[in-house]
Amino acid sequence: MKIVIVGGGISGWISALIFSHRQPNHKFVIVESPEIDTIGVGEGTTGLFSDVIDELPDINFAEFLRKTKATPKIGIEFNNWSGQGSSFFNPIDGTPTTNDDFDSFLYFTYTQNSSLDTSSLHGLLKRSNKSPYTIESGRLKDYNTALHLDNKLTVQYLKSKSLNRKNIKHISDTVFEIERDEIGTVKKIICSNHIIEGDIFIDCTGYKRIFSSKSDWVSFKDNLPMNSVTTFTRKHQESMVTKADKLKLGWCWQIPTQERLGCGYVSCDEWGDDVVDEIKSNYSDAEIVKSFKFESGKLKKSWNHNVISLGLAYHFLEPLQATNIHLTLVQIDMLCQKCIRDTKDRTLNPNVISYYNKHIDNLIEDFKNFINIHYSCDSRVKMTDYNNEIIDLLKVRGLFHEDILQAYGSCGIQLWGHTLLGLNHLTKQDCHKFLSEMNSYDEVKEVSSELEDTFTNIPFLTYKELIDIL
């Protein structure tokens, strides 16, 4: 089959690399417009991105960190979300009891430390400014880490690797027309200098969504009202933690790369328009980059006929928990493992397409609910019905593993649990009650000791030591 990827950016080039590696018998064409620049100033990932980079045979992880100026990401620090001066840490790795039916160590940690930065190995690393890397047999070994990326450098690196692949053809051109048959199947794309036919088209055109119409869009603005982003940069700070600061008109992310902080203020127009003034008053060294509007939501179908929309071409959710790159990778993995086959007929089977769309829709609903829950202390934002039920369950008896969607790529109980407790939806007395009911006190004390031993006995590199050896 001939698979045409339309659009560059991180989603386009990582798609080209993964598809061509895992589906080597197909032909791949990537069409990248020379007129479109990279939007982001900095972006965080989940641990899945590191796993993918490790899997690709022509990418050396240490080289990737060095060339892209990426830094480890061990979690997100949320400031002022449940009130001015409040703070909590949501780690990448989760607690030692994350996979148990009841995450007892999380509740125990909250009774001791409501900031939750002692619930996990990554939390202990944060407190000591250590990285989640060691040197073993002369090579870097990571302990379940994610990354902070410089978007432009990452795109350049992924593109350079893709151009060396024999089964990827790169065309620099701009699409201005799409030709479909009578039932809506795309037959060819017409560019300024090329006419390109294909069997499957992968839409990685981001907000432009050139294969879709406005009628295909499902809005989430009732529960996710943020609709504007102003990006800016700040001076470099040595850090391995994303910061998410709640402000008057929304919230601000700060992502540390090796050379700067990539930042963005996500705001709601209905709450006010003095965004730049608020940025300057909170971050005196801010250098404004650009602003753009958005609407949270998704397409009705990620896979429609022979077009598969990935990343921002399929959805937009404010970048509160690195869901964009994460979902793109989940989509690609599902397509490679369970959907794309040796022939066009087998691949475009209606039941295969339906299976894929249902799974991706469930994930987006999970992500929507999860991002919405962060605003549960802000009366201006309407909670989803699901989140009202989850908060009620939490207060009555805590959350169990099966209370949250357990599907490949979903947020999972680890992220939900830290967020709900970090937002102070429970008291310490509540947590003591739940631990007593679960007979968990002996277990959590033992787990606490084992966690401290692990942290003490492994020679984790400091931030400076890691950067110096790259």
Residue ranges and their predicted role:
Residues 142-276, 332:
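Predominantly flavin-linked oxidoreductase catalytic cores and closely associated redox partners
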Residues 1-9:
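Beta1/beta-strand and adjacent pyrophosphate-binding region of the FAD-binding site
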Residues 37-131:
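Dinucleotide-binding Rossmann-like beta1-alpha1 core, especially the glycine-rich loop
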Residues 247-295, 315-326:
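Conserved FAD/dinucleotide-binding core of flavoprotein oxidoreductases
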Residues 324-342, 356:
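An active-site-proximal "capping" alpha-helix that borders the catalytic cofactor pocket
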Residues 303-320:
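Short FAD-binding loop at a beta-strand-to-alpha-helix junction that anchors the flavin cofactor
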Residues 20-41:
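Glycine-rich FAD pyrophosphate-binding loop
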Residues 72, 341-470:
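Long, low-complexity C-terminal extensions of enzymes
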